[in-house]
Amino acid sequence: MTIQTLFKPDGPLASHIDGFKARAPQLEMAEAVARAIKSGGRLLVEAGTGTGKTYAYLVPALESGKRVVISTGSKNLQEQLFYRDLPTITGALSYTPPVALLKGRSNYLCIERMNRLLSESHLQKPEILNDLVKVKSWSIATDNGDVGDIPGLQENAEILAHVTSTNDNCLGRDCPYYDDCHLVVARRRAMDAQVVVINHHLFFADMAVKDTGFGELVPQAQVYVFDEAHQLPEIATNYFGKSVGSRTIQDLAQDIQLAYRAEAHDMAQLGKAADRLAIASQDLRLAFGVDGGRGNTRDMLRQPLWGQALARLNDAIGLCYEVLKLALGRGEQLDHAFERISELRTRLGEVLAVNQTGFSYWYDCSRLHFTLNLTPLSVAERFSAEVQRPEVAWVFTSATLTVDMRFDHFKAELGLAGSAELILDSPFDYGEQARLCVPRYLPEPNAFGRGEQLANLMIPLINKTPGGCFFLCTSHQVMRQVAEVLRREIGRTVLLQGEDNKQRLLKEFVENGRAVLVATSSFWEGIDVRGAALSCVIIDKLPFASPDDPLLKARVDDCKLKGGDPFAELQLPKAVIALKQGVGRLIRDRTDHGVLVICDPRMVNKPYGATFIKSLPAIPRTRELGTLGSFFDRTERCE
């Protein structure tokens, strides 16, 4: 059956799916995907919000009968595809291939680590014990081991790190529970499936494993579809680099202690070596200073106190290595700990070998933890080699792939020159549904107290807004300033990112209907609030990355060395993509109405402002905040 027939008004999709009506851009995308699948090669599709891109790639992918891997940028979309969209489409096509959902290892219960924690329960904190009871009770009945399903457990609960595994602490085939391992079972299902739904992190983890020559995590396929593909460059960069973090070090120190008690309690030096490792990790964190932050590792290596703390950590790692070497053969936990300390020693040397070219060496330090990172400046060559497989189709789609209607930036980041391209506008009527305002008399982007000034400037608009409002900020400092003023001055519920987890904040926002949510980057994308609950999106300034970001600095320097223009080639495109994501929160349906306010004068008084405007949907623009109230009045009358 042809794609056109499947999408016809009297076709199988319309007959099976209530309210389904094919849109012209959706059909155009589906036909392009079908051609790519038939001929192989690469296809880039920017599909505006409301295009219906999920069905546009699912239908031809399933109709092809080939093995398909679909990768998403978020677990939410991954689950939506598997539990909602795939059953709908397979039902409409009367075709039920074996399908599988596969997540990364941190999503699955590790039976061995849970049982080890139970055996050491007398050593645990009360809050860990309370959650351990929930985990154990749930583990008896679960059929997939997905820890996201544990009832009554916070999504960031401390216990999750203790009952899931990492690449470092997994015992692999030496584990006594290997045959019952939830992760192993999930991977087996995926290997037997025709359609596998994964996420981008898992795709790149699989590439990293294949590079080592030790098997694979994701089955080979004939068709790969990447939804939310704009996230790929950043995720790829993280996976093709290396890192050493204090969490990993302290987790290893704890596991050495447990192995000492369980398998070699006569070797007191094991316990002492583990203590020394944990203390050395904590000392290195303190050497970063109270504020922490991000920076260049080369700069830290020049500081004597930091160098001394690093030397103590190296000594502690060396001691653990020698003591564990003496304990080899006394137990599986000890043998595995020796493998991990060997890997840690090697990796620490790699992230500190700061004289290699083509990499950024940087650290990220929070209140309690640090990470030392080695990150490649470009992943284009490595990724391009991956997508050259003959007779394999690669489809990349998102609402935000282009800058000024061109794919150049995305193609350069991933080495996708020569790909077929398709840009599809949103079917929404932005002329009727939305207004864009860049107000006059704005404070400068780096003005002192800017958050307070913006909040006071926006109060009349927020009060006039019939529904809810997102106030999206580019820094936590401005976010807190805005929230403080709004809570003092307006009679609405003001929700603040960080005061509760993301899902509960969104739930309260939607249920309230007139709340203001003040947030930063994590709410710029992947949020779908339809109807009047979100009628206004305010963006504090253009989302340029901080010039102090060590990875950006390294890329800027590299671009200059090659004779390029780092602002035009790096900073501007990334800011445009980020702004398009933030703007995309506003209109999610044909019946939505709302206003978008961008509080940055550079949109109109800098030459590059035109690039931002041309990259956004064709929303009628104004500079007068006061006119937005009449837009709301008109839309309310129409309703």
Model regions: which residues?
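A contiguous, basic/glycine-rich beta-loop/short-helix subdomain that forms a polymer-engagement track
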Residues: 160-196, 207-214, 319-442, 449-456, ...
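Conserved RecA-like ASCE P-loop NTPase motor core of nucleic-acid helicases/translocases
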Residues: 68-76, 396-397, 467-474, 597-599
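A substrate-engagement module of RecA-like helicase motors
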Residues: 2-16, 66-194, 257, 289-295, ...
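Conserved pre-motif I regulatory segment
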Residues: 2-45, 59
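Conserved RecA-like P-loop NTPase helicase motor core
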Residues: 439-449, 499-604
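Signature of the SF2 helicase/ATPase Hel1-core->accessory helical subdomain module
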Residues: 63, 79, 84-87, 167-168, ...
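Conserved helicase motor "Helicase C" RecA-like lobe of SF1/SF2 P-loop NTPases
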Residues: 474-498
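Walker A/P-loop NTP-binding motif
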Residues: 34-35, 54-67, 84-88
